[in-house]
Curated annotation (Swiss-Prot):
Domain of life the protein comes from: Eukaryota
SUPFAM superfamilies in UniProt: Acyl-CoA N-acyltransferases (Nat)
GO biological process: ornithine metabolic process; positive regulation of protein catabolic process; regulation of polyamine biosynthetic process
Organism: Schizosaccharomyces pombe (strain 972 / ATCC 24843)
Protein name in the entry: Ornithine decarboxylase antizyme
UniProt-recorded Gene Ontology molecular function terms: ornithine decarboxylase inhibitor activity
Record function comment: Ornithine decarboxylase (ODC) antizyme protein that negatively regulates ODC activity and intracellular polyamine biosynthesis in response to increased intracellular polyamine levels. Binds to ODC monomers, inhibiting the assembly of the functional ODC homodimer, and targets the monomers for ubiquitin-independent proteolytic destruction by the 26S proteasome.
Family according to the record: Belongs to the ODC antizyme family.
Length: 226
């Protein structure tokens, strides 16, 4: 069945070319904390509707998110012509079923549900779709602006098999705070995943807590205040 509600029609985000990940890029010369002339490894990318952020290593040995470096390293036309990434149907269905209402209330939503009250449509239109590419995983997300003006990032990975899950989650937390300006992060976890016990331990290690939800039978939700 076609999705009639734009809230659930996850816009395909610009895919990350394989040659970008693990490549080198120059630091942003505008930043005050970068060492000029040093090149850094690209560890992950985040694409939004209008921007692309690069997660790269630092001379000190850590990693951080920055913007604009990719724009300078490749022509804007090439950036615009990147292929579009297919959004798996199960990910769209997961957001469709378990994504809270803009008020923060988790409510049952079925594939036959109506478009919703007109007073909510403006809030749905404000939801921004993003994609985060790592070398071992790809995350589909929605950034929602809540009624109080705060932002929440909802994420579903294409795979939970990433052996570097903790490092990836730390990078995503930095992204949510420093670049997307979110105050809360929520992850959707498949309850049928064979690695669920390990995942729960990893999520608790990073600082996530289970969230109560209604009628979300296939997924467990884990959240963190940022």
């Amino acid at each position: 069945m076609a999705f009639r509600n734009r809230m659930y029609q996850l816009s395909n985000v610009d895919d990350a070319d394989a040659d970008i990940l693990n490549s080198h890029f120059a630091p942003n010369p505008r930043g005050q904390n970068h060492t000029h002339g040093r090149r850094r490894n690209t560890l992950a990318l985040c694409t939004t509707k209008d921007q692309m952020f690069v997660y790269g290593s630092t001379p000190a040995g850590g990693a951080e998110w920055c913007s604009e470096a990719l724009e300078r390293s490749r022509p804007r036309a090439a950036f615009k012509q990147q292929r579009r990434r297919h959004v798996p149907r199960w990910i769209s269905d997961s957001f469709r079923t378990c994504l809270p209402k803009p008020s923060g209330i988790l409510k049952e939503q079925t594939v036959n549900e109506e478009e919703g009250n007109s007073r909510h449509r403006g809030k749905y239109d404000c939801d921004e779709r993003i994609g985060v590419a790592e070398s071992m995983n790809y995350w589909h997300g929605i950034v929602r602006t809540e009624e109080d003006g705060s932002k929440t990032l909802f994420l579903i990975p294409e795979s939970w098999e990433d052996v570097h899950l903790k490092e990836g989650l730390v990078a995503i937390i930095d992204l949510a705070v420093d670049r997307l300006h979110c105050s809360k992060l929520v992850l959707f976890v498949d309850k049928n995943n064979s690695s669920l016990p390990y995942l729960v331990k990893s999520l608790h290690w990073v600082g996530f807590e289970p969230l109560p939800h209604l009628n979300c039978s296939d997924h467990a939700l884990f959240g963190m205040e940022l």
